[in-house]
A protein has these predicted regions:
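Mixed-charge, Lys/Arg-enriched low-complexity segments
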Residues: 1-20, 60-83
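Acidic, low-complexity, intrinsically disordered interaction modules
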Residues: 18-71
Length: 83
């Protein structure tokens, strides 16, 4: 499922559908791959990956995107980083 990341005109619709307005301002658009839009949180530097057509959430692991639920995706983005 993983492919090249295409960077072009930002697509904010999946993010706007997933988060409240005050929260999506903290994300940067990084591109799209295989129909999954990639956003990076400005502070945690973690990604929130959302299907452009489905609104489903994904996490990148072992060279591929695996589907996870919304709660897991949000938790991943905001959990403290371990150093």
């Amino acid at each position: 499922m993983s492919g090249a990341i295409e960077v072009g005109e930002p697509d904010w619709k999946p993010l706007e559908g997933a988060l409240s307005r005050e929260n999506y301002a903290d994300f940067m658009y990084m591109g799209v791959t295989s129909g999954i839009v990639l956003y990076k949180h400005r502070d945690t530097r973690r990604y929130l990956n959302i299907g452009s057509e489905t609104g489903r959430f994904y996490r990148y692991a072992d060279g591929d995107y695996i589907e996870i639920n919304r709660e897991q995706a949000i938790e991943h983005v905001y959990e403290p980083r371990q150093i």
